[in-house]
């Protein structure tokens, strides 16, 4: 066993003494030691219940002859960090999580590891560590939140964000907003729509590193506890077989995950996260990989913010495997690859049925003939930008005058003050990985635009990123970012910007000579940052490579 290095032989008597100080017996130390990474905290609705999940996992480990040992890592709620300086720490926390798990697992030489998380950056941080460590491992989430109910309609946290703009526009009273606030999020779990957290949870199934139903079984359902127990039992089988992440996280696994992502109309953040996980797994992904797969993958699902359904509906429709079953009809799924279930994808799909065609459409009548995410290039984004086409109105081209802001706060103030007009292109820059630093999510401005009824008439372009709850003509991850002197740094108020969805282009319609003059005068915008953000800014690479640390 891997763990023998810390528990076998007379030289390890001091080590055993320390384990015994925690109540462990010789019998427990003779068994495989399974690390349980639990990101429980009292700060995130998706993590508040993870102690219960961890206890069920540990029960499963013990049932199958292992000794579970739990430790923790950090987590940030993007919703609570949204719209202020705290969001600068969200994406950077991904690297901290990966590094912290690596440190503990290497120090203790576990025989296997179970990773428990529910929300945005914690999941990819854990999967990065999983790929890096390459010991038998399995992931389980805490499950999605149920949608709330307000005035006879299902709602979620996105509804509340957009309601702020509605109040400012006089379309909703503050009293109604308070009631909505009370009813929108009825309990624990990752937010009820297909935002970043639930997209990533779905993709753990598609990648094959979690058990069936992990991506969609609700947080409060007993099914979630059963999955947790099964996960604890399954890690023991993975240890016995010595099946490692490198056996599962293959190029084909990432291709399948991207196909599922596109069929789901998933969060734009998945582009960053899948590239980061793939890098740790030694698999090369580029923006073009995403676009190539998106071009041949139909959008089969529209879950909030793109449509009226929620993750609960997807669960009732058959879950992630039901989407993969549909995609397999088009030859878009590699059915011979192995998963943590110790079954191939094809074996898992054999008995799967789609239970609700209204949620997962047949491939013969998709919402879109292509996938939900699109990569744009052009003079404003020479190295690429990302658009969630599944969450935009039927717009093929948009041309408007730039309204330029050097931070999110200034843009939100202008939007809520009524200073943004129909036809404007809101440009928010110096919010990239280096320039923010931290690449904040722009949910506050996009929600304000949508809440004020301008989502068909105003575009937003940024070198920052977006929440999975964002909808409308919102283009993020513009690369190179402003802090690196990218073209977005040279945009001035009144410049024309043209977005051509059909041609997959975003262009700054300014004379080349004029841009050369502006470039000659440009100076980097210096921000005073300290501590981790200062180190992060010095190490992080561009969004078009996943905003990972340079080698």
UniProtKB/Swiss-Prot annotation:
Biological-process GO terms, alphabetical: isoleucine biosynthetic process; L-valine biosynthetic process
Pathways per UniProt: Amino-acid biosynthesis; L-isoleucine biosynthesis; L-isoleucine from 2-oxobutanoate: step 3/4; Amino-acid biosynthesis; L-valine biosynthesis; L-valine from pyruvate: step 3/4
Reaction it catalyzes: (2R)-2,3-dihydroxy-3-methylbutanoate = 3-methyl-2-oxobutanoate + H2O; (2R,3R)-2,3-dihydroxy-3-methylpentanoate = (S)-3-methyl-2-oxopentanoate + H2O
Keywords, in A-Z order: 2Fe-2S, Amino-acid biosynthesis, Branched-chain amino acid biosynthesis, Iron, Iron-sulfur, Lyase, Magnesium, Metal-binding
Annotated binding of Mg(2+), by residue: 78, 120-121, 441
Family as reported in the entry's similarity comment: Belongs to the IlvD/Edd family.
Functional summary from the UniProt entry: Functions in the biosynthesis of branched-chain amino acids. Catalyzes the dehydration of (2R,3R)-2,3-dihydroxy-3-methylpentanoate (2,3-dihydroxy-3-methylvalerate) into 2-oxo-3-methylpentanoate (2-oxo-3-methylvalerate) and of (2R)-2,3-dihydroxy-3-methylbutanoate (2,3-dihydroxyisovalerate) into 2-oxo-3-methylbutanoate (2-oxoisovalerate), the penultimate precursor to L-isoleucine and L-valine, respectively.
Subunit structure: Homodimer.
Protein's recorded name: Dihydroxy-acid dehydratase
């Amino acid at each position: 066993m891997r763990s023998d290095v810390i528990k076998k032989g007379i030289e390890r008597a001091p080590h055993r003494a320390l384990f015994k100080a925690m109540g462990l017996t010789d019998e427990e130390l003779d068994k495989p030691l399974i690390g349980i990474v639990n990101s429980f905290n009292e700060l995130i609705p998706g993590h508040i219940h993870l102690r219960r999940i961890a206890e069920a996992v540990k029960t499963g480990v013990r049932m199958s002859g292992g000794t579970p040992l739990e430790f923790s890592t950090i987590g940030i709620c993007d919703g609570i960090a949204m719209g202020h300086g705290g969001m600068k720490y969200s994406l950077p926390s991904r690297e901290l999580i990966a590094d912290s798990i690596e440190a503990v697992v290497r120090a203790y030489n576990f025989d296997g590891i179970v990773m428990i998380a529910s929300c945005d950056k914690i999941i990819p941080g854990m999967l990065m560590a999983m790929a890096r460590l390459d010991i038998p491992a399995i992931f389980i989430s805490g499950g999605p939140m149920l949608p709330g109910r307000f005035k006879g309609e299902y709602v979620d946290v996105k509804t509340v964000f957009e309601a702020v703009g509605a109040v400012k526009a006089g379309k909703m009273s503050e009293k109604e907003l308070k009631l909505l606030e009370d009813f929108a999020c009825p309990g624990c779990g990752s937010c009820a729509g297909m935002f970043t957290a639930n997209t990533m949870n779905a993709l753990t199934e598609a990648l094959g590193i979690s058990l069936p139903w992990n991506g969609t079984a609700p947080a409060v359902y007993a099914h979630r506890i059963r999955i947790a127990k099964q996960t604890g039992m399954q890690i023991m089988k993975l240890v016995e077989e010595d099946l490692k992440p490198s056996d599962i996280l293959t190029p084909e696994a990432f291709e399948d995950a991207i196909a599922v992502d596109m069929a789901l109309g998933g969060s734009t953040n998945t582009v960053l996260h899948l590239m980061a996980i793939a890098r740790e797994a030694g698999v090369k992904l580029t923006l073009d990989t995403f676009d190539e797969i998106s071009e041949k993958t139909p959008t089969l699902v529209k879950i909030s913010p793109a449509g009226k359904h929620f993750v609960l509906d997807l669960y009732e429709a058959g879950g992630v495997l039901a989407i993969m079953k549909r995609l397999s009809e088009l030859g878009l799924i590699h059915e011979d690859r192995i998963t943590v279930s110790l079954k191939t994808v094809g074996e898992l799909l054999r008995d799967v049925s789609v239970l609700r065609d209204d949620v997962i459409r047949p491939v013969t009548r998709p919402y879109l003939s292509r996938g939900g995410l699109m990569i744009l290039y052009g003079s404003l984004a020479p190295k690429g930008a990302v658009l969630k086409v599944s969450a935009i109105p039927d717009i093929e081209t948009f041309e408007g005058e730039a309204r330029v802001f050097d931070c999110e706060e200034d843009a939100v103030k202008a939007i809520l003050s009524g200073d943004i007009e129909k036809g404007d292109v809101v440009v928010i820059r110096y919010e990239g990985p280096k320039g923010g630093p931290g690449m904040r999510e722009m949910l506050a401005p996009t929600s304000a635009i949508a809440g004020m009824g301008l989502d068909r008439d105003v575009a937003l372009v940024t070198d920052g990123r977006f929440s999975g709850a964002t909808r409308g003509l919102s283009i993020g991850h513009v690369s190179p970012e402003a802090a690196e002197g990218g073209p977005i740094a040279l945009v001035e108020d009144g410049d024309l910007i043209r977005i051509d969805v059909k041609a997959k282009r975003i262009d700054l319609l300014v004379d080349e000579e004029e841009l050369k003059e502006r470039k000659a005068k440009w100076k980097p915008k210096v921000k005073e940052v300290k501590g981790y953000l200062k180190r992060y800014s010095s190490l992080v690479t561009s969004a078009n490579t996943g905003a990972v640390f340079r080698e």
